[in-house]
């Protein structure tokens, strides 16, 4: 299964063999049988990649990644050299971009999911038992990873 990050560690604890393929390789890997399933993005992105042509089940919710954060990284010295006005422009532009991206993304998902159903994709939901199992394994992974000082600092 294509998976990444802590979610991959959870799936491995549940007996799943995971692979961290780049997004552009998912379709081909599914088509060739190199992987049987994939976690990736949201329904609109799945549609753009054509995943409905090869994957016939889509499970919700995405328990491992409740949101995606876009970021703009600016060198500290470059930031310090900017005027307060330019810093404010950049901050507000980023906020507006995030707001727009979230709103557009959420607005289009229902139509995209309806289209996926028309293309034969079954929309399924994880049972409460499966979500509890994911949570239990997630907690185990976090305890193990917390032995690393940097992980512990970031996670807490």
Language-model region placement:
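N-terminal secretory/targeting leader peptides
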Residues: 1-156
